[in-house]
């Protein structure tokens, strides 16, 4: 900018000052531009989370960015974890980067604060500042700074000494910061700072410590602090700003505020101009050095050697087709300079294979590379399944290759540890990610702060659609919804704050899969963050920024299915020592018969009820079919499933857009399913190279009209040159457009379908071992354990109760069924379980409960363990029932303990050596008790195992429950979100609360069926109607809307059905079409609604839908709640006679 500002903001917080700052970076930049500021700084609390985003957006807007932090500084050493002599643990300090060296020092300082100095806050100390002060400007910050704190404590000499220390370290780049927010303590501090400035020759600077953009955003900032601290706005003595002056003020406002200290204003501009040369260099990904054996001269030569050796391992006969494909890929990889990347990936994959850590068949487009297949990075043959290399690495579009690797869930950490050891702890880290305040979540968070009852906020969020692109502003654009959200003053306050806070960062966490590796220490490129709850170190920058900053990114994903397959393999080898999952046939009839019958529960990627039905209809008979169904079963392409099935069955003739496309489309029966097929069509018809075809696919997928139009010209030109009719070629091009958006990555579908086939093979051929492995895989997940036990029963496999003489750590297969894994019992720690099994294997089975007590170490096994073990049924196969063991436990422990002590005393006595080393022990005389009741025994199993094994309280009601329920809580939740569902089971818990707003009652509970449990919410109206049914232990059915809030699914209950009437109930759907010319008669419309409501007689459930036409659009509306009646002919006839009704029908 050509103008010179009169004031520059150098103390600015964004929402990356988590749950403290309430300003989005884009809004900060917009305000700076609006205020004609040439520069602006970003100084978030202790971090650089938003630095790169801020830098780029400011540059784009023509504003010079100043990168800084408001650091937390320990008064003495950052390693001291206690309060200092001022009663504080850290103090604020502003640090600004003058140049790239200053920026690099900020990277170091903020990293040190998290990795070394964290104590409630990420802290640095004076040693760090002395070491990394070059290139930095420092100001004394707010009244939370060290110098202001000393002034407020009347320690004036100490304050002066601190000023002199900072002046010595930073020289002319240290400034005393003045703030005027209308706070008394600031006035006290400012007076002293002005005095010291003149005494000590340290310049002043003015600041406004902005935490939000505009004055009117003060309430939103106050609320976000409440969200962070768990406070309510009405709470007294909570943390909050003292005034509403902490916003980005205009130059005019700041000049007026500091008109008595013009030098403080001028110095903000001088500081900004010191930063004019600041520039961040973005080097792009820099590969770490990979050491190759001395006999090879280059990385490319070594990669070629490994590839050829790998091809010999993969293929019996190396045909010219295989070698040509491999050498073509190698030429592209080496030509683009990515041979080092392939070697790095190969190296840690080799470590995994060498250490028996299962690796996935592939993930994403990487499975399209034959070099990756040869190196065992992937495990699916790209030639066999016609997978394209250019979908992964396109020579016509330079971008870093990106292998996403699935590892066995249990082995993933070993891989990360290996990579860290190989390249160095300072060169490997995980990646940060940020949770944001999404529309529904922000409404609920703000509602809590404003003390709006949960029931009310939940009702409000019902009007907010789900989806990544939904915004509150769009919701409020609907006038009817706007009226709802502003119907009360407190709702207006809620929405005003929510609109400001929506989309802001809420918390930092670690990316589930991302790993970065650098050539030199990471802090040469990025700042680091440590999550002290998890103990993981991650980058402060998000995944999308890391490669341009100089890092190489990998995705290491933990896939439980690989752990499952490994466990199943190990179990099967007890009966088939040579079994290997890699050697199973790919055309097993038993497997495809099972899938064709829809018996795919617990089969990877095919377990949902919807997919089970599709398998029944499609009758897949090859892995190619599974790949296609896997790709089609998702929103968008799902509409083509009937066409696919009809063509596969021969019901419908297969149509190809052109005979030349038959080979490409034959595996999918003429339906374009894959992105790779779009590329192949562009190659065959338009004469495109596969690289150019990939660019076309991307343009179509992202709906880039200009780019598509340009490429269509090339496509038609190429088609004509190849002899195709222009009109037909144009039709084919237009046909590709929707499919490129719907089309799925075949490489990914193929790799995952291979894993799916492997799990299906295991279930079909080794069901007991497969289910045992599933149970072990989910040993700490009660819901999943319950599901797999039910699935085991459904396929005729008995899951046995825990048995002290037959059970092992994990679930195992026995002649009688699957023995229960001891690690799945609550209060039985792994060490204790190991001790029990080791003793049993060393000295034989336990003959009685007393024998067990005498043989185990009483220092390891305590009373709580024994009580849990008894209740769980662990000793049922021995001599006494559970009640008898439980009631005699204290006495038995006492007797055995006394015997052990007597034995020790005897061995230490003068005559002990003459006594028998194994004295005869008296058998314990039990006082016998009648066994617990059946329901009590089941209750114990639920308590200790997390579910029921020997039976289920719902067994008598199974038929009624199965006929009533429409929801499988393990497989249907995502698919049925926001829809009306029916669910029945036992009420495990009920909590009734009284709302603060009107003292009405509502309830929360948990209801469980055979497959798992789900939360229920019962608002006041429904609670009052059904309160007599909502008792703990009752078996009931509920009807309501399935919702997802705070990362949790729940059913908002509208109706409750007594167990006796479950089988009688079903939901009827009544459809009413209006005569549009009569819709304006509100009296008639209201009369109709009243008539429908009067139909309620508790005879059943009905949804009522209205159909009308408004503004040229057909609309379908639903009455708010489910109504209690069955639509008999008499009621329907009354509806048809209404003068505004055109038609009525029921389904």
Curated annotation (Swiss-Prot):
It catalyses: DNA(n) + a 2'-deoxyribonucleoside 5'-triphosphate = DNA(n+1) + diphosphate. GO terms for cellular component: cytoplasm. The keyword Transcription does not apply. The keyword DNA-binding does not apply. GO terms for molecular function: 3'-5' exonuclease activity; DNA-directed DNA polymerase activity; nucleic acid binding. Its EC number is 2.7.7.7. Keywords: Cytoplasm, DNA replication, DNA-directed DNA polymerase, Nucleotidyltransferase, Transferase. GO terms for biological process: DNA replication. InterPro entries: DNA_pol3_alpha_NTPase_dom, DNA_pol3_alpha_thumb_dom, DNA_pol3_finger, DnaE2/DnaE/PolC, DNAPol_HHH, NA-bd_OB_tRNA, PHP_dom, Pol/His_phosphatase_N. It is an enzyme of class 2 (transferase). It is found in: Cytoplasm. SMART domains: POLIIIAc. NCBIfam families: polc, PRK05673.1, PRK06826.1. DNA polymerase III is a complex, multichain enzyme responsible for most of the replicative synthesis in bacteria. This DNA polymerase also exhibits 3' to 5' exonuclease activity. The alpha chain is the DNA polymerase. Belongs to the DNA polymerase type-C family. DnaE subfamily. DNA polymerase III contains a core (composed of alpha, epsilon and theta chains) that associates with a tau subunit. This core dimerizes to form the PolIII' complex. PolIII' associates with the gamma complex (composed of gamma, delta, delta', psi and chi chains) and with the beta chain to form the complete DNA polymerase III complex. This is DNA polymerase III subunit alpha.
């Amino acid at each position: 900018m050509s103008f010179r500002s009169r004031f520059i903001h150098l103390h600015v917080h964004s929402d990356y000052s988590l749950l403290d700052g309430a300003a989005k970076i884009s809004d900060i930049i917009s305000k700076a531009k609006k205020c004609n500021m040439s520069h602006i700084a970003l100084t978030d609390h202790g971090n650089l989370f938003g630095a790169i985003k801020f830098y780029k957006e400011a540059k784009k807007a023509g504003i010079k960015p100043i990168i800084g932090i408001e650091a937390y500084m320990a008064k003495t050493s950052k390693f001291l974890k206690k309060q200092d002599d001022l009663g504080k643990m850290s103090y604020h300090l502003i640090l600004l980067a003058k140049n790239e060296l200053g920026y690099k020092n900020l990277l170091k300082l903020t990293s040190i604060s998290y990795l070394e100095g964290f104590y409630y806050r990420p802290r640095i100390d004076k040693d760090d500042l002395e070491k990394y002060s070059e290139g930095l400007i420092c100001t004394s910050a707010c009244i939370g700074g060290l110098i202001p704190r000393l002034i407020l404590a009347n320690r004036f000499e100490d304050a002066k000494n601190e000023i002199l220390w900072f002046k010595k370290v930073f020289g002319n780049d240290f400034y005393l910061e003045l703030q005027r927010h209308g706070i008394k303590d600031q006035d006290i501090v400012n007076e002293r700072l002005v005095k010291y400035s003149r005494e000590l020759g340290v310049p002043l600077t003015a600041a406004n410590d902005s935490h939000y953009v505009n004055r009117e955003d003060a309430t939103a900032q106050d609320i976000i602090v409440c969200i962070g601290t768990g406070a309510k706005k009405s709470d007294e003595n909570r943390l909050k700003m003292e005034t509403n002056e902490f916003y980005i003020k205009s130059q005019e406002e700041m000049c007026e505020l500091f008109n008595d200290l013009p030098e403080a204003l001028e110095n903000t501009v001088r500081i900004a101009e010191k930063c004019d040369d600041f520039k961040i260099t973005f080097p792009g990904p820099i590969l770490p050095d990979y050491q190759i054996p001395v006999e090879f001269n280059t990385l490319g030569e070594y990669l070629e050697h490994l590839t050829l050796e790998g091809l010999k391992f993969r293929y019996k006969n190396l045909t010219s087709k295989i070698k040509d494909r491999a050498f073509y890929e190698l030429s592209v990889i080496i030509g683009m300079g990515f041979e080092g990347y392939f070697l790095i990936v190969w190296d840690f994959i080799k470590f995994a294979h060498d250490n028996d850590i299962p690796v996935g068949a592939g993930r994403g487009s990487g499975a399209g590379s034959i070099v990756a297949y040869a190196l065992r990075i992937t495990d699916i043959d790209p030639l066999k399944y016609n997978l394209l290399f250019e979908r992964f690495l396109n020579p016509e579009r330079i971008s870093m290759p990106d292998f996403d690797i699935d590892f066995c869930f249990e082995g993933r950490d070993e891989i990360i540890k290996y990579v860290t050891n190989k390249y160095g702890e300072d060169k490997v880290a995980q990646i940060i990610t940020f949770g944001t305040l999404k529309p529904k979540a922000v409404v609920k968070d703000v509602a809590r702060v404003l003390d709006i009852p949960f029931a009310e906020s939940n009702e409000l969020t019902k009007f907010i659609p789900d989806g990544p692109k939904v915004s509150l502003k769009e919701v409020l654009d609907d006038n009817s919804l706007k009226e709802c959200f502003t119907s009360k003053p407190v709702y207006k306050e809620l929405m005003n704050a929510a609109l400001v806070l929506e989309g802001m960062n809420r918390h930092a966490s670690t990316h589930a899969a991302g790993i970065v590796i650098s050539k030199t220490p990471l802090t040469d490129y990025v700042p680091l963050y440590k999550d002290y709850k998890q103990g993981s170190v991650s980058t402060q920058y998000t995944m999308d920024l890391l490669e341009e900053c100089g890092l190489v990114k990998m995705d290491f994903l933990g896939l439980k299915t690989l752990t499952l397959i490994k466990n199943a393999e190990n179990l099967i080898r007890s009966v088939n020592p040579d079994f290997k999952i890699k050697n199973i046939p790919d055309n097993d009839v038993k497997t495809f018969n099972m899938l064709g019958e829809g018996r795919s529960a617990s089969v990877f990627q095919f377990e949902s009820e919807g997919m089970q039905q599709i398998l029944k209809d499609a009758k897949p008979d090859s892995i190619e079919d599974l790949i296609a169904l896997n790709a089609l079963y998702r929103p968008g392409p799902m509409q083509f499933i009937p066409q696919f099935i009809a063509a596969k069955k021969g019901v419908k003739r297969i149509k190809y857009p052109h005979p030349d496309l038959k080979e490409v489309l034959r595996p999918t029966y003429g339906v374009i399913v894959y992105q790779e097929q779009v590329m192949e069509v562009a190659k065959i018809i338009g004469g495109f190279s596969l690289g150019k075809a990939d660019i076309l696919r991307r343009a179509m997928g992202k709906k880039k009209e200009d780019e598509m139009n340009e490429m269509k010209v090339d496509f038609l030109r190429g088609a004509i040159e190849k002899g195709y009719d222009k009109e037909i070629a144009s039709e084919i091009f237009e046909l590709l457009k929707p499919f490129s958006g719907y089309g799925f990555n075949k490489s990914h579908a193929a790799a995952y379908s291979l894993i799916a086939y492997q799990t299906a093979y295991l279930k079909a051929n080794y069901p007991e071992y497969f289910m045992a492995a599933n149970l072990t895989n989910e040993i700490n997940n009660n819901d999943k354990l319950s599901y797999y036990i039910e699935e085991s029963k459904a396929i005729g496999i008995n899951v046995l109760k825990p048995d002290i003489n037959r059970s092992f750590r994990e679930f195992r297969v026995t002649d009688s069924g699957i023995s229960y894994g001891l690690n799945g019992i609550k209060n039985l720690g792994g060490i204790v379980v190991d001790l029990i099994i080791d003793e049993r294997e060393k000295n034989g089975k336990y003959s009685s409960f007393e024998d067990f007590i005498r043989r185990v170490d009483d220092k390891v096994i305590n009373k709580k363990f024994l009580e849990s073990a008894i209740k769980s049924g662990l000793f049922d196969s021995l001599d006494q029932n559970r009640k008898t063991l439980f009631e005699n436990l204290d006495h038995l422990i006492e007797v055995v303990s006394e015997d052990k002590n007597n034995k020790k005393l005897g061995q230490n006595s003068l005559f002990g050596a003459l006594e028998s080393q194994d004295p005869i022990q008296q058998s314990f005389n039990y006082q016998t008790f009648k066994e617990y009741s059946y329901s009590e025994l089941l209750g114990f199993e639920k308590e200790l195992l997390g579910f029921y094994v020997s039976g289920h309280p719902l067994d008598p009601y199974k038929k009624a429950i199965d006929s009533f329920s429409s929801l499988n809580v393990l497989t249907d939740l995502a698919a049925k979100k926001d829809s009306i569902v029916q669910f029945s089971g036992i009420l495990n818990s009920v909590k009734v609360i009284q709302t603060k707003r009107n003292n009405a009652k509502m309830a929360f509970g948990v209801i469980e069926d055979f497959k798992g449990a789900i939360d229920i919410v019962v608002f006041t109206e429904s609670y009052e109607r059904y309160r007599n049914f909502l008792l703990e232990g009752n078996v009931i059915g509920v009807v309501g809307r399935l919702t997802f809030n705070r990362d949790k699914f729940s059913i908002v209950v509208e109706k409750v059905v007594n167990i006796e009437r479950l089988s009688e109930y079903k939901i009827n759907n009544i459809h009413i079409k209006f005569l549009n010319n009569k819709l304006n008669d509100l009296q008639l419309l209201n009369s109709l609604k009243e008539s429908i409501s009067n139909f309620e007689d508790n005879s059943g459930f009905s949804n009522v839908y209205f159909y009308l036409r408004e503004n040229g659009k057909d609309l379908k509306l639903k009455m708010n709640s489910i109504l209690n009646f069955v639509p008999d002919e008499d009621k329907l006839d009354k509806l048809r006679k209404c003068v505004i009704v055109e038609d009525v029908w029921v389904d």
